[in-house]
Every structure is written in C-alpha cells, then in structure tokens.
Amino acid sequence: MAAKTLLKIAAIAAIAALGLSGAAADTRPRVLSAALPTPLPLPYDEAADAKADVAAAIARAKANGKHVLLDFGGNWCPDCRILAGVLELDEVEGAVGETFEVAMIDVGRFKKNLDIAEAYGVKITAVPTVIILDPQGRFVNAGHPTALSNARAMKPQAIVDTIFGWVSTAN
C-alpha cells in the first residue's frame, strides 16, 4: 500500500518537474528568428478614420471576448515600424489574431488622433504608444503605454513578452 502511495507521489512530482502545469498558463508565442520583414511595414493609414477603426475594434473584441491593442504611431517612426514587423512575424501573427483586435492609429507628427489616447488618460509623448483594453474595455497596461517606444533596442521576443504579459496579468 505504501509503495503505491509513493509511486503516485513520484508520478505527480515528475509531472510537476516537467512543467506541464505551467505550460498551459504561458500562451506567449516564441519568436524563433530575429529576422523582421524587409522592408519594414508602413502600418499606419494616414487617411483612415481612426475613431471608427477604434470603435470597430472595440465592438469586435467585446463580441469575440478578445483584448484590444491600440497602436498609436507614425510611418516615419522606426520603433513603430519595428513593432509592426514583430507583430507580422509568422510565429506571432496568429497569436495576435487570436488574442487581440488591433487598431493602428496614425498620430502624424503628434498632431492628430491624440484625443483617442487622451480618452484613456494617456498623453502621447513617444511612439509607439500602446493601449491594451480587456474585452470589457478596461485599460490593462495603464502606466506602461510607452514601454515599446524604444523597440529598436529590444529583441523581438522581449516585445512579444511585453505585449502578452499585459494580457496575462489582466486575466
């Protein structure tokens, strides 16, 4: 009888040692290569109706139980283009689509669409500025919207970990 109990305890310990219980909790994509697309994307549509794009992303997120990723920037900004390139990597793009409804918001040279961020209490002082909302519309990365504004100094995995880390701490 004691041998069976010890065997069960050993089996549980082995499973725990393999990390199977923790693997399900971490859904961050793993960036297998650091090669970003070339040329880097130009993700911000200067002619877009940003308010309509944000409203549509929020509506889709609410309907689908996803988070919203609001990315404020400009095509002139290398950090913004690097962030967009990371989001387009094969190993990242699918997870982004499963987790987020994304709206890319052009701020020009800090002269337009700033009121959208201000509605969440964010004054845009650097780009990219990223606001993550949960499916109920709550701002989950408050205090850190410019964490990716130096994306060129970050490895792609660090960018992914930052974005998905905001989601995992919100759940």
For each predicted feature, which ranges?
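Active-site-proximal beta-strand/loop segments in catalytic clefts of secreted hydrolases
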Residues: 72-74, 105-108, 133-135, 144-145
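N-terminal targeting signals for export/organelle localization
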Residues: 2-46, 171
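Loop/turn elements at helix/coil->beta-strand transitions in domains of secreted/extracellular proteins
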Residues: 64-69, 98-103, 126-127, 135
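Non-catalytic, surface beta->alpha helical segment in thiol-disulfide oxidoreductase systems
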Residues: 125-171
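A short beta-strand-turn-helix
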Residues: 46-68
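Conserved redox-active cysteine motifs that mediate thiol-disulfide chemistry
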Residues: 72-87
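Structural alpha/beta surface segment adjacent to cysteine/selenocysteine redox centers
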Residues: 112-126, 136
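Thiol-based oxidoreductase modules, predominantly thioredoxin-like and allied folds used
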Residues: 48, 85, 89-113
